[in-house]
Amino acid sequence: MIISSLTNPNFKVGLPKVIAEVCDYLNTLDLNALENGRHDINDQIYMNVMEPETAEPSSKKAELHHEYLDVQVLIRGTENIEVGATYPNLSKYEDYNEADDYQLCADIDDKFTVTMKPKMFAVFYPYEPHKPCCVVNGKTEKIKKLVVKVPVKLI
């Protein structure tokens, strides 16, 4: 997992080249003006823009991926993301959805929480469990975010 901000002048230091290029591309866009839905960045990388309502972590499922990295960027609002600090016990997870590259689980072992603010991004590698769109300070809110899907083979 990597956490930084698109406004940090040194955000690219240490990032895999393809992730740095994705972030450079995002910095050319008016993120607030992006319409919800899928946007292809190229023939292998795409992003989903969404405006979900945050919710209590207990009402949400954690997710992890096998073939894609997530680059989650908060555009508007605040959200907590619960993150697993250790390799997940996959026996606790639902069956893998190969078509959409995810596995779900009710909760995350050995978790910590990251509070996201606008222009921050978090990179989740395969098998890194995360539970996005959780409330901050117990207050639900409608947020706007995007999730870039990068095939792990490009890293």
From Swiss-Prot:
One of its GO terms (molecular function) is metal ion binding. Cu cation binds at H65, D70, H130. It is found in: Cytoplasm. GO terms for cellular component: cytosol. It catalyses: N-acetyl-alpha-neuraminate = aceneuramate; N-acetyl-beta-neuraminate = aceneuramate. It comes from Haemophilus influenzae (strain ATCC 51907 / DSM 11121 / KW20 / Rd). Its cofactor is Zn(2+). Keywords: Copper, Cytoplasm, Metal-binding, Zinc. Gene3D superfamilies: YhcH/YjgK/YiaL. This is N-acetylneuraminate anomerase. PANTHER family: EVOLVED BETA-GALACTOSIDASE SUBUNIT BETA, N-ACETYLNEURAMINATE ANOMERASE NANQ. Signal peptide: none annotated. Opens both the alpha- and beta-forms of N-acetylneuraminate (sialic acid; Neu5Ac) to provide aceneuramate, the preferred substrate for NanA. Has preferential activity on the beta-anomer rather than the alpha-anomer. Accelerates a reaction that is spontaneous at slightly alkaline pH, facilitates the reaction at acidic pH. SUPFAM superfamilies: Clavaminate synthase-like. It holds the Pfam family DUF386. Belongs to the NanQ anomerase family. The keyword Cytoplasm applies. Has been crystallized with Cu(2+) but reconstitutes with Zn(2+).
